[in-house]
UniProtKB/Swiss-Prot annotation:
Cell location: Secreted
Protein name: Snaclec echicetin subunit alpha
Keyword line: Disulfide bond, Hemostasis impairing toxin, Platelet aggregation activating toxin, Secreted, Toxin
InterPro entries per the UniProt record, alphabetical: C-type_lectin-like, C-type_lectin-like/link_sf, C-type_lectin/snaclec_domain, CTDL_fold
Protein source organism: Echis carinatus sochureki
Cysteine pairs bridged by disulfides in the record: 4-15, 31-127, 102-119
SMART domains linked: CLECT
Assembly notes: Heterodimer of subunits alpha and beta; disulfide-linked. Forms an active complex with the pentameric immunoglobuline Mkappa (IgMkappa).
Entry GO CC: extracellular region
Entry comment describing in which tissues the protein is expressed: Expressed by the venom gland.
Length: 133
């Protein structure tokens, strides 16, 4: 599609592909090997729909993996999550098991809702990259 590498899908000036089973950090590093490559970001409803359809098309229905990494991560300090209690005090991770700092799309929501999970799990992931020159 639109000069993307074989097997990749074109959308609004970039190329996208689903890959299998890495932790969030491994997946981001893997995506970095392509020009402008990163885990996919979702900035609009139209893009969310494109990504959901891409995953549904590429991830076998028989696959046991029902979650897919996206490029969203809580970058707050390691011992605190980015959420606050209603009185504005911080939530400390020692009370949250496991730490949930990276986000997936889940088959149960037809790959349309963002869900925070432990970054060390291994899931399939979607890379976004510039069109190869």
């Amino acid at each position: 599609d639109q000069d993307c590498l074989s097997g990749w899908s074109f959308y609004e000036g970039h190329c996208y592909q689903l890959f299998r089973l890495k932790t969030w950090d491994e997946a981001e590093k893997y995506c970095n090997q392509w020009d402008g490559g990163h885990l996919v970001s979702i900035e609009s409803n139209a893009k969310a729909e494109f990504v959901a359809q891409l995953i549904s098309r590429k991830l076998p229905k028989s696959a046991i993996e029902d979650r897919v990494w996206i490029g969203l991560r809580d970058r707050s300090k390691r011992e605190q999550c980015g959420h606050l209690w209603t009185d504005n005090s911080f939530v400390h991770y020692e009370h949250v098991v496991p730490p949930t700092k990276c986000f997936v799309l889940e088959r149960q929501t037809e790959f349309r809702k963002w869900i925070a999970v432990n970054c060390e799990f291994k899931f399939p992931f979607v890379c976004k990259a510039k069109i190869p020159r």
